[in-house]
Amino acid sequence: MMTEKSNGVKSSPANNHNHHPPPSIKANGKDDHRAGSRPQSVAADDDTSPELQRLAEMDTPRRGRGGFQRIVRLVGVIRDWANKNFREEEPRPDSFLERFRGPELQTVTTHQGDDKGGKDGEGKGTKKKFELFVLDPAGDWYYRWLFVIAMPVLYNWCLLVARACFSDLQRNYFVVWLVLDYFSDTVYIADLIIRLRTGFLEQGLLVKDPKKLRDNYIHTLQFKLDVASIIPTDLIYFAVGIHSPEVRFNRLLHFARMFEFFDRTETRTSYPNIFRISNLVLYILVIIHWNACIYYVISKSIGFGVDTWVYPNITDPEYGYLAREYIYCLYWSTLTLTTIGETPPPVKDEEYLFVIFDFLIGVLIFATIVGNVGSMISNMNATRAEFQAKIDAVKHYMQFRKVSKDMEAKVIKWFDYLWTNKKTVDEREVLKNLPAKLRAEIAINVHLSTLKKVRIFQDCEAGLLVELVLKLRPQVFSPGDYICRKGDIGKEMYIIKEGKLAVVADDGVTQYALLSAGSCFGEISILNIKGSKMGNRRTANIRSLGYSDLFCLSKDDLMEAVTEYPDAKKVLEERGREILMKEGLLDENEVAASMEVDVQEKLEQLETNMDTLYTRFARLLAEYTGAQQKLKQRITVLETKMKQNHEDDYLSDGINTPEPTAAE
């Protein structure tokens, strides 16, 4: 069986009765199976038909002994087949992105202090273990934790205040509140620990040093608020009783985590305007809820039913149960803060002060709603308004120039197609605020699959690839539009992203070929390859059947890009010649003639360069000879002066020497 697989010969089920069991599958353990079946498993990854063949062999009834062996073999085959099918394939790295991005940047962390000696080895190991528990504030796990901590914060901000104001709510469900309270306390404490293990960026690098993380958090105001929010004020229950949830108001100080969750959600969501509106509505509902609770407390302190402004007497069955109490107060708070309804007028001074305060808050809420909602709606409709302005301008121009109705309808349909398919975004305008590196990376991610289909660009340099993807321009053609006509000078190449194009005859009806998404044409004509039988003219009529999205690369942009990459230009031209040669569109005689002309031009250029070098060399030699002669003359003059000075010194010494006296 193994020999047949390696030779590519598949045995028939009829012949399988004479085969022995594969030696790689044994009943005595996993090691023998792994050791003996390594080549077989590699071969089995290519095709599942041998496995199915072996399964069919297992089903074939046999006579005699060996039933247990057959069961073991069947189990082994099924296990191998399942492992092979459920094995995750590693994604093949894309060479285009690898050439552009280069090697991935490894995670760099900053540490405090220098470790020395063998004693430090254990410290490093411990530090590595601690680093495993450092959360990246930009990661998904940190965001999930923000969602977890936002829930108890919102619970305390809503229900803790309501329980403190509505005593029936606290007394009827106090067991549930105890469980939720201490669960939220546990989450608060866990959040304090996680904040101590949350990294931060320092010069763009994620800091994971425990001491730095601790110091960075402890010296902030948020740390003081977090500690204050977990102070065990519940101990006051022993003095005032368990039905006094107001002693837990310090839990409201943990509000920053909820706001942080909202901010991160706004940056992550694909619908930021809708989230902002929802967030604003939530804030308004919380304010109305708090105001309703405060109204109930004020009514309780003044006395229920004392006057028309306070809450009615709870002895009345209609107003004496919890649901009616809260709904009535919420209704009163909504009418007061929104100033859209009539409420009973206040009677006492404290009632007047509270209503005045509520009216001021209501005005601020109304202004906030109008401002924020108006701004959000304007932002949501900004793209449509801009697009509609373009359509109106085109309509006005066509009416002014008295364009035919058919052409006007065609233009309107083209605009409708752009809006329906969300193709109104100007890529240059959207990406202009990004640095060049990020723009290039976005462009290569967006246009990568398209650019890879162009034959001449498959092996180009990474730098040239970046230049090219930045120069690709999207174009949309309407049904019946000619992308190019036979005999036109080719100044652009096109890559089909969506739609279908037809290669048609001169009559525009007869179709020779159909081009679909992924096809490209015109890439050879923009290279100006010598010897091409096509030259730089189009050889066919190409027409759009429906609305077609194409990417265009102009000849000028390509030449501008390859100016800085002469080697890449040679590679592109050589690859273009190979393609033309395979398709029989290269005139070898003309190529040879052009090569001879090129050689002759190179020889002439070389002779000119040699003459120039000879002239420069002769000039340098003359300058050298003249400089050497001048140097010799200066040396001769200096020697003469030195000799003259030496003689003068000798004579002066002889004159100044006194004659010896007779006594001496």
UniProtKB/Swiss-Prot annotation:
3',5'-cyclic GMP binds at residues 522, 525, 538-539. It is found in: Cell projection, Cilium membrane. GO terms for molecular function: calcium channel activity; calmodulin binding; cAMP binding; cGMP binding; identical protein binding; intracellularly cAMP-activated cation channel activity; intracellularly cGMP-activated cation channel activity; monoatomic ion channel activity. Olfactory neurons. Widely expressed in brain, enriched in deep cerebellar nuclei, olfactory bulb mitral cells and cerebellar Purkinje neurons. Expressed in olfactory sensory cilia (at protein level). InterPro entries: CLZ_dom (IPR032406), CNG_cation_channel (IPR050866), cNMP-bd_CS (IPR018488), cNMP-bd_dom (IPR000595), cNMP-bd_dom_sf (IPR018490), Ion_trans_dom (IPR005821), K_chnl_volt-dep_EAG/ELK/ERG (IPR003938), RmlC-like_jellyroll (IPR014710). Pfam families: CLZ, cNMP_binding, Ion_trans. GO terms for cellular component: ciliary membrane; intracellular cyclic nucleotide activated cation channel complex; non-motile cilium membrane; perikaryon; plasma membrane. It comes from the Eukaryota. PROSITE patterns: CNMP_BINDING_1, CNMP_BINDING_2, CNMP_BINDING_3. Keywords: Calcium, Calcium channel, Calcium transport, Calmodulin-binding, cAMP, cAMP-binding, Cell membrane, Cell projection, cGMP, cGMP-binding, Coiled coil, Ion channel, Ion transport, Ligand-gated ion channel, Membrane, Nucleotide-binding, Olfaction, Sensory transduction, Transmembrane, Transmembrane helix, Transport. The record marks 366, 370 as: Central gate. Residues 462-582 are annotated as: Cyclic nucleotide-binding domain. Residues 169-178, 244-248, 299-321 are extracellular. Residues 382-458 are annotated as: C-linker. Changing residue 539 to M: Slightly decreases the affinity of the channel for cGMP. The chain crosses the membrane at residues 147-168, 179-199, 225-243, 249-267, 275-298, 322-356, 357-381. It catalyses: Ca(2+)(in) = Ca(2+)(out); Na(+)(in) = Na(+)(out); K(+)(in) = K(+)(out); NH4(+)(in) = NH4(+)(out). The channel activity is inhibited by L-cis diltiazem. Signal peptide: none annotated. Residues 272-380 are annotated as: Ion conduction pathway. Residues 339-342 are annotated as: Selectivity filter. It is a multi-pass membrane protein. Residues 1-51 are annotated as: Disordered. Residues 599-653 form a coiled coil. Belongs to the cyclic nucleotide-gated cation channel (TC 1.A.1.5) family. CNGA2 subfamily. This is Cyclic nucleotide-gated channel alpha-2. It comes from Rattus norvegicus (Rat). The gene is Cnga2.
